[in-house]
Structure formats: structure tokens, C-alpha cells
Amino acid sequence: MDNKPAQERRETWVPGAVIVGAGPSGLAAAACLAARGVPATVLERSDSLASTWRHRMYDRLALHLPKRFCELPLLPFPEEYPTYPSKDQFVAYMEAYAAAAGVAPRFGATVEEAAFDAAVGAWRVRLDGGEVLMARWLVVATGENAEPRVPDFPGMQKFAGCAMHTSEYKSGEQFAGKKVLVVGCGNSGMEVSLDLCRHGAKPSMVVRNTVHVLPREMFGLSTFGIAMALLRWLPVQLVDRFLLTAAHLILGNTGQFGLRRPKTGPIELKNLTGRTPVLDVGTLDHIKSGKIKVVGAVKEMTRQGVRFTDGKEEQFDTIILATGYRSNVPSWLKDAGDLFTREGISKVPFPNSWRGRNGLYTVGFTQRGLLGTSSDALNVAKDIHCQWRERDRSAINVLEISNSSF
């Protein structure tokens, strides 16, 4: 902990909660607190809210789930929005959401450390400029996708072409006619491969492990919506069996195209490991036609391309790493107790992962997307509000006792 005098640290007590992160999770937490009359200071390291969506997502991205499953508490999406809003529409929704709730984040505020001070019963949040904010409650809302996850492949520095993470990828337009290797077969890897194909590139996609691919819609309805409805009445295993049977009827045997399915069903696997099934938006047809080539795991990179684990070598102009993101919580949060793993993932399973000790809360670490974010935000706001209200009662009692003594 910083031992400088308070005046050098520019120590400031702030009312209510400090929320770290101004993405969907942080905005939802702040809005739900504001609705209950609890103030919050929202800290955001970038220059805008929803910065990951605004700056790190590719142009063709749209929500994979229908908008009714992705809206945040207190404000639905505009009726004129399509079923699957685009990236730009989602960012506009976030802007409107913050404005409607009166949430004004402090931009350019990077948290270097947050630690609980037992002596005063509050959290000390130190910013990169030296300022220290003191608050009774700390809400961690930086999310599970704060930093790009970039694997260190052997020979990576040798590659003479362009290598980038999907956080830098915007459109396949610049890759027309080029051979591109996409490393990763999750939703991002699948969509980037599709985008490259539609812009005239020659993509190959690395599929290292088994993967569940489901149609985004079944029988004219959202696959996710069908699954959620069935789970109200049926056990996970039966719902998984239904989804896989329907997927086989609609998509065929994906295994014959290099997309082998795990033995565990898609929902059960998601619950156990956090691995999300791919919702196909057209990529599979291009794999079947051969326009997108499925390849195995990468052993190392070479000057002209890569060497695969089966010993084969292939040349590529560009390598795009669709290897996901990671949490940055371990780099700045101290005294997290039993709430986070060393990798910054919640130790506590949903729906009880939102509350820690000493006034520590989290929003958006459920591995359940925006639905989990909304659930967390509502729970956090309710819990903090109860304590905030109790504090007001205590203050009134003290005032009444003081007045009665005269």
C-alpha cells in the first residue's frame, strides 16, 4: 500500500460506490444504483464508454442472441432495431442507456490498484495519476474480455507477414486475394473467416479441439430462446439431446468437415467449463463448399507461414489470432479473497458470483453474457441499497439522540 501522506496521494472520499469499467456491466450497475438513489463514481480507462465494443470489434459483428436477451435493466432496445442489432446499434444503445440513467463516467481514469483498508472499512482505489478514491463499496465491472489473449507461438517473431489479434481486425476488405490463417474456431473465428471469404480472401481456420456448432435459429425461432424455454421444464441433458438432434437435421454431420463435437452436450459443457457453443451465421456453408479450409493445430510459425502439428507446412500472407480475451482483474485488484482465481475468473458459480467480502462486488463475470450482467447488476444494486438505507437510518437515530439531549 502507498505510504505517502494523504495530501500527496490526493485522497478523496466519494459517496456510494466506485465502479471500475464503463462497458455494459459498469453502466448497468450504475444505472441500477441510480434508480435506487445510490450514487456511484464510474471509472473508465479509455476515452469512451463501451470501448471494447466501439474499438475492438469487427465491423460485421451483430449480437448473436435476440435483442430481448441482451437488453440491460430499466431500458429495452428501441423497437425499430432488428432482432440482432449491429455493433454500431449496440454502442448507440449504450450511449442512450447512460444518458437515460444520468451516468457520466470519468474517462481516462486507469485504476492501478484497489485494496481494502480494514482500519477505515473502505476501499482505496489508486489511479495512475496518483489520486486515491475512498469508497465503502467497490464494484468490479471490467469484465472477462478486458485484454486480448495472445498466445506466444514458437517462431512468431520469424513470420514475415502480418499477424494480428481479432481486436485489431475490422474488415476483410484489405485481405482480398490473400491467404489468411485464422487461429481459433469460436464465434469470432467463425465470423472473421466468413467475413474474409465474402471479401475475396482465401481463409483457413485452425480447429484444434472439439466444438459445438448450432444454428442461430431453429424452426424460425432463436436457438437460445428455445433452449431457455425448455430448461424451465426439462433437465439439461434432455435439452442438449434435443438441440443436437435438431442441429444434425439442419446442419448435417459437422464432424465430416473437421468440426468434431464434444461428448458433453453444449449447455452442460457451458455450465462446466464456460465454453460457448458457436451459433452459425453462414460460416458452415462456406466450410462445406471448401471456400473456408479447416486445418489442425499450429506447432510453430515460420517465415512464410506455419508448420502444423501433423508436420505439414503452408504459406500465409496474414495470420489472425481469434484467441479470445482475458480478465485484467489480477493486475490491479487486491484483497479479492475467494472471489477470483489467479486468472481473474470468478470462483463462485452463477448466480452467486456477484458478492464478495468487505463491500466488494462484481458484475459481468458469470460467463453468461449480457443476461448474466443484468442479473448481477440488479442484485448488486439491491444489496448496496439496503446498506445505504441502513446508513441513513443510523444517521437519523444519531441525530434524534443528539436533539433529545438538549
Swiss-Prot record:
Tissues expressing this chain: Expressed in coleoptile tips, root tips, leaf blade tips, shoot apical meristem, vasculature of stems and flowers.
Reaction(s) this enzyme catalyzes, per UniProt: indole-3-pyruvate + NADPH + O2 + H(+) = (indol-3-yl)acetate + CO2 + NADP(+) + H2O
Residues reported in the UniProt entry to bind FAD: G21, A22, G23, P24, S25, G26
Domain of life: Eukaryota
Keyword NADP: yes
GO biological process, one term: auxin biosynthetic process
Cited InterPro entries: Auxin_biosynth/cation_transpt (IPR050982), FAD/NAD-bd_sf (IPR036188), Flavin_mOase-like (IPR020946)
A molecular function GO annotation: flavin adenine dinucleotide binding
Entry cofactors: FAD
Protein name, as recorded: Indole-3-pyruvate monooxygenase YUCCA1
Protein source organism: Oryza sativa subsp. japonica
